[in-house]
Amino acid sequence: MEYKQTLNMNKSGFPMRGGLPMREPDMLKHWQELDLYNELLKKNEGKPLFALHDGPPFSNGALHMGHALNKCIKDFMVRSAAMRGYYTPYIPGWDNHGMPIESAIIKQNKLNHKAMPIPEFRSACHDFAQHYIDVQMEGFKRLGVVADWEHPYKTMAPSFEAEEVKVFGAMYKKGYIYKGLKPVYWCYHDETALAEAEIEYQDDPCTTVYVKFPLHDDQGKLTGEEKKNLSFVIWTTTIWTLPGNLAIALNPVESYVIVRNNQNGEQYLVAEALMEKVMKVGGVEDYTVVSRHEGAFFENMLADHPFLPKTSRLVLADYVTMDSGTGCVHTAPGFGADDYQTCRRYGMDMVVPVNDQGRHTDYAGKYAGMLVEESNPVILKDMQEAGSLFASEQIVHSYPHCWRCKKPIIFRATPQWFCSVDSFKDDACAACDDVRWLPAWGIDRMKAMIRERADWCISRQRRWGLPIPVFYCKDCGKPICTDETIAKISKLFGEFGSNIWFEKEADELVPEGFTCPHCGGKHFEKETDTLDGWFDSGSTHFASMQKDQGFWPATVYLEGLDQYRGWFQSSLLTAVGALGKGAPFKECVTHGWTVDGEGKAMHKSLGNGVDPADVFKKYGADICRLWAGSADYHVDVRCSDAIFKQLSQNYLKFRNTAKYCLDNLTDFDPNHLTAPADMEALDRWAITKLNELLVRCEAAYKDYEFLTVSHAVNDFCVVTLSSLYLDIIKDRLYCDGKDSASRRSAQSALWMILDAMTKVFAPILAFTCDEIWLQMPHRAEDDPRNVVLNQMTKPYADYALSEAEMTAWETAFRLRSDVNGVLETARADKRIGKSLEAHVALFAKDEDTKAALEAVKAIDLPEIFIVSNVSTDEAAPAEGAVVEAGVSYPGLTVAVSEAKGTKCPRCWMHSETPDEHGLCPRCAAVCKALNVVFE
């Protein structure tokens, strides 16, 4: 007799292998036909708002793993919020203006951009940006991100530009925006100012110099002995800035010494705290301290410049420290913010002896026309020959580089537009207190950056950007930005785009009949600079979120760690400055960088990069999503083929668990779940463990801890289900009667587990969970079209076992662990084959073990151990039994011998009361109900 056909060995249409690269595109098509994003909004319309505002990626290249990590996390946030009952609008955005696109278009098309009409050049930039919006959008769609792809916001869109102009106007009206000559980061390779967020620091080798500035005028304060052969010794790492020196700064309260070099009679002024170090660097071994004075004593003395015909003034500054150098600080107002402020305080004129191209001007004398880096060795040689070089050293220091061209930059004073952050720093810091920061240290980082930052340079000497909406009166020369001009420019930009600024003359752009508010003049010029790209992206909360989406503030901002000084900060500053509100986000979350498998930065030159498109083709987008969902994204996230291979193995465990459930639910109707009172205790144990999973995952989703969700689901699949529950219930599912209460109990639990597990993992494993959902039987209240259109399962409180009952079950599983160890020994000794061939006898040697055996009396131990018989009351182990002590219970003795009775040919369990066909009573009853004909 072939009994296989009498077993409940059903098969679903769910394949064991995912075949994700082939299957996912079909699912994307299904989602598109379903219009999943809008269906999701309809489903939760009128419910509490969860608004993730998309930090715009720059539209200048294909997708990289940083993009993938960022968009995966955002999609996890949106999907999980939707499935927890929130209304979740999600508008993707792109940042379009800026130097990287200009540079790329010039290089790609070999353009002479300076000879091109500006509107024509800007149109080429626009097309370039739009191309990469399309490229990136397709990549994000392939990743499975649910968003309003039909209506993204773009900072180059006329509607956006029209609103950004209003942000500028509001800040100008409040007096927060001004034009001034101040030192800013300057890339002379690209000939533009840079913001702090556009700076990258790299370790560069350099020559540091200690330079002697001979005393010129002591203001009658020094004795004859003190001023004899006296020089003020400064230290600098930027030799090329020395032509711009106007002053030497001392700390007013620190002690300074005049030191005589007994070898050559020269005298030097240095800080006493640094004297020994300076003398050692200069090779001066025999020296004498002539006198001591506080720094304030030397104020307004004059020193001769070491190689130019001019003097340098001794000034005081609190920022002069005793950490390094000489205590006498080289001060060039055209090349440093502190230098600028100090010289301004002393009424000195601004001197900027370097032009836009990074070349010295005529002010630098013989060095005129030289690039700054070319002048370094020439100046060094001249100082050596003139005897003004005290010492020099070779060091490696951290130096700022342009984020785009990767070349060193300079600090240089130029006429620029600034946002006076000082005016509202306190308000910006106070706004941080109302934000939930993840990680929690984010608030301290943001506040420190705001407090320490200088005024924000918002102008750029570029063409591809939003024009600064300021006019100049030709009669009085004053800048003009009024409510009337802002309204007119906003209207024009909204209708025609910002190219109109470059296509029309100023007189055509101002309001009709407009006159200068300062002098009544009627003729105007336009500002030629464009706005910093960070002003663009910093305006998205107003230009896109508030205007187009109708909400403010956002629930959450999520971006990389670098955005504390980038988008997070620019958004905060424009919100506080322009709108007079708090932060534009209630929560601020950061993620780390993506790095290679060894933790190194990924670079094309190193060949260690990972292309998301390759991951999609080889493994599927769900594996990429699982990578993002399995990582502690607050720190750097490693990425390599080996990691994806391992994740694929973890993925198969989840998929195989789902397949097991689906295969055993093909004949099950979840509208008729077994009632709690009728459900088998083991099944209720599994549901109680499921409840624990659901509670843990709900808390994790609230805190955006997706790693916790992934690990919890994986542990539940591997430990709770595969290793225990699913293995134990196979007999009931396959061998009990199809409609028996015991089998329906197991199926009910299986359905509850699969339903809840699929929903709880759906935000992360979007494609696979939806594939499972489409295969599952559903209740009447479920939406069968897509798993994300359903709410996450709440814990099944009515099915939960009591704490005492759960303790008893945990005891049973600890006993099972000890029994399994002895079964393995018996199998290795060939005493038994399958575990169903075993009879297990348990013996307690101490009170704890006796109590454990007493606690599990009500539990069906043969079912739990997957053996034919279990006894706890035998006097001694059977002769020939394999006997071992327990591990979980050292007072336990486990004896394994051959099972008593006859092996049932249908279920393979041994029975002492078989029927005439050798069937155990259970199988005999099932076969009878099936009207099995025995030949």
Model-derived features with residue positions:
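N-terminal catalytic cores of NTP/NDP-binding nucleotidyl/phosphoryl-transfer enzymes
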Residues: K42-S103, I234-T241, V315-T342, Y346, ...
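Secondary-structure capping and boundary motifs in well-ordered enzyme cores
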Residues: N44, P48-G55, G66-L69, I73, ...
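Acidic, turn-prone loop/beta-hairpin segments
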Residues: D95, V184, Y188, L194-E200, ...
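Short cysteine-rich clusters marking metal-coordination/redox-active sites
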Residues: C187, C402, C473, C516-C519, ...
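Cys/His-coordinated zinc-binding microdomains
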Residues: E191, Q461, G477, G520, ...
